[in-house]
Amino acid sequence: MVSSITQAEIFIALVVAAHAGVLAVRLCVSLYRA
């Protein structure tokens, strides 16, 4: 079965999204505490 999006690409996308989410949360917390 050949798909345009492989499991590896999905995994990488999830890691990037999670990392961006963590950075966004840390930024919001730092701004809230400032």
UniProtKB/Swiss-Prot annotation:
Key words of the record: Membrane, Photosynthesis, Photosystem I, Thylakoid, Transmembrane, Transmembrane helix
Disulfide bond positions: none
Parts of the chain that traverse the membrane: 10-32
Which gene is the coding source of this polypeptide chain? psaM
Pfam families, per database record: PsaM
Q: How does it sit in the membrane?
A: Single-pass membrane protein
Protein name, entry field: Photosystem I reaction center subunit XII
Where does this protein chiefly localize?
A: membrane
Cite the NCBIfam families for this sequence: PS_I_psaM
User: Which BP terms does GO give this entry?
Assistant: photosynthesis
GO CC annotations?
photosystem I; plasma membrane-derived thylakoid membrane
Q: Which family does it belong to?
A: Belongs to the PsaM family.
InterPro entries from the xrefs? PSI_PsaM (IPR010010), PSI_PsaM_sf (IPR037279)
Q: Where in the cell is it found?
A: Cellular thylakoid membrane
